[in-house]
A protein has these predicted regions:
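Active-site loop immediately N-terminal to the catalytic Tyr-X3-Lys motif
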Residues: 39-43
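SDR active-site lid
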Residues: 62-125
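A transmembrane-helix-recognition feature enriched in membrane-embedded lipid enzymes
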Residues: 118-149
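Conserved catalytic-site region of short-chain dehydrogenase/reductase
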Residues: 35-37
Length: 149
């Protein structure tokens, strides 16, 4: 929670006075698809990403009158050291290797979202499908994430 939520929340509040003075000011928070739909065995991580999504929505409302855009980026698995260090499960490491997005690609999409002021960006087709499924058929989404994580 300290890294995924508390730090971005405090940094956002600290940046506010500078953002108010800026031309076309914007703030981008990096969430996760797991901030839209929780999955088994990643409870704390999911909770922190739900929190950053909620913070982003609240700041967007609070800062709208100041002309500050508040953006939220939701990547799926990114090829980083997170899985290597945090998860010992061989299946998880294999899953990462097959489906992880390159950090450079995440950065490119983030930059495009910034330039075009896209407020909520889901990065992958699989992530979009999971969010969509959770909205229209939450029981099926629950079954799917329980089955395949």
């Amino acid at each position: 929670m300290k890294v995924n939520f508390i730090a971005p929340a405090e940094l956002s509040r600290m940046a506010y006075p500078l953002l108010v003075k800026g031309e076309q000011p914007a703030l981008m928070n990096i969430g996760s698809i797991l901030g839209h739909r929780a999955v088994p065995w990643k409870s704390e991580y999911c909770a922190s990403k739900f929190a950053i999504r909620g913070l982003t929505a609240a700041l967007r409302s609070e800062w709208k009158s100041e002309g500050i855009d508040v953006l939220h980026l939701s990547p799926s698995t990114t090829d980083s050291q997170f899985f290597d260090q945090a998860i010992e499960d061989t299946m998880q490491r294999n899953w990462k290797g097959k489906r992880a997005m390159a950090p450079k690609r995440v950065a490119e999409i983030a930059l495009d979202a910034w330039v075009n002021r896209r407020r909520d960006v889901l990065l992958t087709p699989g992530g979009k499908a999971l969010v969509w499924l959770d909205r229209i058929a939450p029981r099926i989404a629950s079954w799917a994430v329980t089955r395949w994580g």
